[in-house]
Amino acid sequence: MDLQSMPQKPAEAFPLIAALDLGSNSFHLCLAKANIHGEVRILERLGEKVQLAAGLDEERNLSEEATQRGLDCLRRFAQFISGMPQGSVRVVATNALREARNRSDFIRRAEEVLGHPVEVISGREEARLIYLGVANSMPDSGGRRLVSDIGGGSTEFIIGQGFESELRESLQMGCVSYTQRYFRDGKITPARYAQAYTAARLELMGIENSLRRLGWQQAVGASGTIRAVALAIKAGGHGNGEISPDGLAWLKRKVLKLGDVEKLDLEGIKPDRRTIFPAGLAILEAIFDALELEQMVHSEGALREGVLYDLVGRHQHEDVRERTISSLMQRYHVDPEQASRVEAKALKVLAEVGDAWELNGELHRDLLSWGARVHEIGLDIAHYHYHKHGAYLIEHSDLAGFSRQDQQMLSLLVRGHRRNIPADKLAEFAEEGDKLVRLCIVLRFAILFHHIRGTQEMPSVRLKAEPKSLSVTFPEGWLEANPLTQADFAQEAEWLKRVGYSLNVR
């Protein structure tokens, strides 16, 4: 199929868009919807282990058996994209098909099954798309990221900042190819592991210096192998989901002691990943040692998410979380004028009480800003208990760019913007718990202040915050002339007593 002949229609104009990633180890499908704000909302994810790379012979021809495994998987995927128009589906193939001398035969047959063109992308293009997927799935760290993705036949390295990758490399080492080379019979010995590790270190020598010269502030892993390692280390009690040298060393000892892939019955390692796990672990250890990494975090977003965002064509330098919040407001028909009023007042109050209440962190400001903008999304469901509806929507939605913890905190902020503040739930965040209670109080104040939704100009007030109290002084005689506001704040004082805070209004 001729890619140039595909209609150049904006992705958001399609009811659905899809990305297929034909990897060396697994095939993946993501079905999504894009909107005019550039947000991609994942509707369905499918993945199957195909191990295409295991079907490459010494002459780099793909076996008929491996080809059939791939085509059988694509036939199942085809049911999801049947009838989708040209331009709404992008199919990319990576290392195994880059290497296969007879790839044209597989591609022809795959296109007949799918009805859409298959692109074999270069290692560096793969790296670019991986980075795009990561950047759109994690909060902007403010500095450079090093992203590593251990695939079945290759491993990609990208350094970038914001939504732009600056350096992209692809090395010929992967968990399937190294399994074929060093762990073919499933036996795990120190000697074999050392061979795999050394081979990876030799591959890395060619790019170590260029990566170090550019530098990075955060290391991110974006593959199933890295996710499995992180889960296994966490299950073993060595961290909270991040990967560290100590955690890797513990896991390596554990794997070598077990000695056989059939015995790798460890939490986090799925049965269908056991055969390739030792090879992936050796590659990851080599990456840590070669680049002297102290920590790596895992990103759920990677190649297929990058393909979707590339299909949409949105590459602005922006915090993806801002785009997500804007999309929530649109989706649930939030009144933008009221949201803007509440946000402006909340941020003004934060500036006044931030020092006294230790709310000077960037995340505090972000959470308050986001909470002010989306606190009314539950109204789109029903007015009764709308704060609970809104909290549920935030907690259980896929919010691009948000960490799970940030999403939970935002959900509780929305839950606590009226009636009872969920202090017991907020307390689960340890020392941040009381600060989150204070953020709730700030947001609630801003909402009460604009309860009349802009129908009346509100006065300037003086605020004084103490550890367990907030004093508010209105202009003389104003409250008496505005009994609704007076009643609102009297009721609010009763709610705040329940969480140990006093509200003094005069």
From Swiss-Prot:
It is a peripheral membrane protein. Gene3D superfamilies: 3.30.420.40, Exopolyphosphatase. Domain 2, Hypothetical protein af1432. Disulfide bonds: none annotated. It catalyses: [phosphate](n) + H2O = [phosphate](n-1) + phosphate + H(+); [phosphate](n) + ATP = [phosphate](n+1) + ADP. One of its GO terms (molecular function) is exopolyphosphatase activity. Homodimer. The catalytic activity is found in the N-terminal region formed by subdomains I and II. The peptide that connects subdomains II and III is also essential for activity. The C-terminal domain may be important for the recognition and/or interaction with long polyP chains. Belongs to the GppA/Ppx family. This is Exopolyphosphatase. It comes from Pseudomonas aeruginosa (strain ATCC 15692 / DSM 22644 / CIP 104116 / JCM 14847 / LMG 12228 / 1C / PRS 101 / PAO1).
